[in-house]
Amino acid sequence: MSHTETQTQQSHFGVDFLMGGVSAAIAKTGAAPIERVKLLMQNQEEMLKQGSLDTRYKGILDCFKRTATHEGIVSFWRGNTANVLRYFPTQALNFAFKDKIKSLLSYDRERDGYAKWFAGNLFSGGAAGGLSLLFVYSLDYARTRLAADARGSKSTSQRQFNGLLDVYKKTLKTDGLLGLYRGFVPSVLGIIVYRGLYFGLYDSFKPVLLTGALEGSFVASFLLGWVITMGASTASYPLDTVRRRMMMTSGQTIKYDGALDCLRKIVQKEGAYSLFKGCGANIFRGVAAAGVISLYDQLQLIMFGKKFK
């Protein structure tokens, strides 16, 4: 490989990193209220055990109403700073690693066949998600703890954490470094499943479905991204629930003995339905995720003239 080709690849890697991160930061900030409601719904059983929630939420609308009443509108952005700090490098690394891995595989649909090309897209998406998680997991943990740190209806109700740094300080004091990485194994499995489907299906279906008049259409790209996001998030949601429930036990006396123990106890005590609590919010949350992947395409096209290949 020549020096010029190396410089070109490095330049494209930097473009992917920047565009992916900017797109994600904008979309996640706009979807922060939905993100928080989803996490509150998902973790409400652990919150009941810890005393930070008085009674179960009756649904998404009830969660919105009670949160606004007890904590104020601004509270819907609680944990958003950690989410942006986490999501910027996560999405940026996801997109950048994905394109880098795809270029290393160099699968061509015409030359290698659709099946091999499709498998390459799934692998590059999943591997990118797994690699990115290594760098940002503690921020995801902190975001989850802040978002699920609710203030109940009682006037004496107090929050457990006073901010991002306080989450790190208290967790390290009670659980050590391990506390920041509780739930890491199901997180890796979940992110590989989600990212593999998210990127793999999008990259595979986009050149097949978005042709002719639909090629370059932001609306068509957005709708395709939304449908794929819904499928990917639903498929990986039980793993997401397990990892977040494990996160919630850091600093607590009673903990789960691993991901399988957590999964077994949730199903036994609460029913399999509990693995999908908050999943309905993903219908709305998916709008933000779909916006990221379609906005990413548009930003590259507008700013750098880089078209999908």
From Swiss-Prot:
Organism of derivation: Saccharomyces cerevisiae (strain ATCC 204508 / S288c)
Cellular location(s): Mitochondrion inner membrane
InterPro entries with a match to the protein in the record: ADT_euk_type (IPR002113), Mit_carrier (IPR002067), Mitochondrial_sb/sol_carrier (IPR018108), Mt_carrier_dom_sf (IPR023395)
Parts of the chain that traverse the membrane: 13-40, 81-105, 114-134, 184-205, 219-239, 279-299
Any one biological process term the GO annotation gives: aerobic respiration
Pfam family, one: Mito_carr
Protein name (Swiss-Prot/TrEMBL): ADP,ATP carrier protein 1
Keyword Membrane: yes
Family to which the UniProt record says this protein belongs: Belongs to the mitochondrial carrier (TC 2.A.29) family.
Organism taxonomic ancestry: Eukaryota, Fungi, Dikarya, Ascomycota, Saccharomycotina
Residue span of region Important for transport activity: 243-248
Entry domain remark: The transmembrane helices are not perpendicular to the plane of the membrane, but cross the membrane at an angle. Odd-numbered transmembrane helices exhibit a sharp kink, due to the presence of a conserved proline residue.
